[in-house]
Amino acid sequence: MKAKLLVLLCALSATDADTICIGYHANNSTDTVDTVLEKNVTVTHSVNLLEDSHNGKLCRLKGIAPLQLGKCSIAGWILGNPECESLFSKKSWSYIAETPNSENGTCYPGYFADYEELREQLSSVSSFERFEIFPKERSWPKHNITRGVTASCSHKGKSSFYRNLLWLTEKNGSYPNLSKSYVNNKEKEVLVLWGVHHPSNIEDQKTIYRKENAYVSVVSSNYNRRFTPEIAKRPKVRGQEGRINYYWTLLEPGDTIIFEANGNLIAPWYAFALSRGFGSGIITSNASMDECDTKCQTPQGAINSSLPFQNVHPVTIGECPKYVRSTKLRMVTGLRNIPSIQSRGLFGAIAGFIEGGWTGMIDGWYGYHHQNEQGSGYAADQKSTQNAINGITNKVNSVIEKMNTQFTAVGKEFNKLEKRMENLNKKVDDGFLDIWTYNAELLVLLENERTLDFHDSNVKNLYEKVKSQLKNNAKEIGNGCFEFYHKCNNECMESVKNGTYDYPKYSEESKLNREKIDGVKLESMGVYQILAIYSTVASSLVLLVSLGAISFWMCSNGSLQCRICI
């Protein structure tokens, strides 16, 4: 019995066996990603694919300053509103910036025909040559060119008029019929603008043009219109009951434009030879101009980013990330970040069998922790880590390259009568935007799922690599760990890690230790059986003695009567 108890004590005493464990890296990162199956998975490393910041400024685009219209609108600038005089010297720009509520547009009230189409045309223009299409001093000798001014277009407190148009009036009591032509010899498209005056009453018509009935005719290869003034009293706008309607056309190289009129013509003075440039555009923004450079400009501000997506603004100019409605697009590159909880021990499970990562292993993603008589330590498996890094890096770069198509996305122009078309266009744009957003989010979710599964697989492979080497020279003790049946010094540990473990060398020692341990288990089972029998017999005897004592006491005091019948 003493011998058996000694064996039991030996079995219950702790033994310091050499161990090696497979694990993975963990750190203090708080990055979270989403996958197809999970949300907010904490990971060790990730990359952001979504730009959500801007500088709040208008910047030079690729070193070229924008044309900032300030208080002027496109109409005021291109017609030559005298309050926009500072803009007339601008010949080139990277893009045009207009404020939402421009004060200086058409100073003389009236309708600007096809204004939205003109804006669309100008959005692709990066420079122009402003030139006199009909020189003021010699083109109209039979008409007055100085009295055509108005208080509604005042400048510095004096009546004035557009700087790119001439209001022709009667001279010496007459307004002779006029015919003027221009041949486009600029080898570029030429933008020509003019107007037709509609007086508020017949008296003004006679006073200004010396006739009641007048017409204006404009003809080119692609344009042919005849205008008749509409004389009618109208509500005052900017102090005027009359109106001027504004028109424009693009004259192709070599084409001729002919103006004929016997009154009411607001004649072209300056025209524009257009140079179109890829990447130009018009944005509506309240942002201020700053001394900065960018490759991507939005109405909110400049974006300087190489990321494939942005959620700053759908309207962009330059080389810009694609706009999506997402609030988060983060792609995982590392592993699930689950640092080991000390109370559970060092290890715990990725891939279902290691519960936590190691913050102590900093030189790789996957690796080993060993413990023997010489000490303990971490070591990364450099080969599997490097292969994983290369594979994931190539995948991330491929995703960014495929999705990082640079865009210029400008708003489309519609007039008030095209509201239904504008609404339809918005629905179409919203549909495309939803598709882009869905595709981007789904791509990231799928790739995140694949990356985390890839890491799990790598840890499993490393575990199986060790298991296949050790065979029955060690036993699996859970949590990714093996306990050797033999002594394994640092040299032995290193051979396991690099795949050169000599199984036969340690087989005999392992076999003997396995047999000893199995013997201890058998002896332990015998001891446990003896203890169990002893415990059962002792308990029964105590129960019988207790029952007899109670019965004797109850018989002695009369509580229990005992009769023996023969």
From Swiss-Prot:
Intracellular or extracellular location(s): Virion membrane; Host apical cell membrane
Gene3D superfamilies in the cross-refs: 3.90.20.10, 3.90.209.20, Hemagglutinin Chain A, Domain 2
InterPro entries, alphabetized: Capsid_hemagglutn (IPR008980), Hemagglutn_HA1_a/b_dom_sf (IPR013828), Hemagglutn_influenz_A (IPR000149), Hemagglutn_influenz_A/B (IPR001364)
Membrane-related topology note: Single-pass type I membrane protein
Coiled-coil ranges per UniProt: none
Pfam families documented for this protein: Hemagglutinin
Miscellaneous comment as given in the Swiss-Prot or TrEMBL entry: Major glycoprotein, comprises over 80% of the envelope proteins present in virus particle.
Protein name as catalogued: Hemagglutinin
Organism for this UniProt entry: Influenza A virus (strain A/Brazil/11/1978 H1N1)
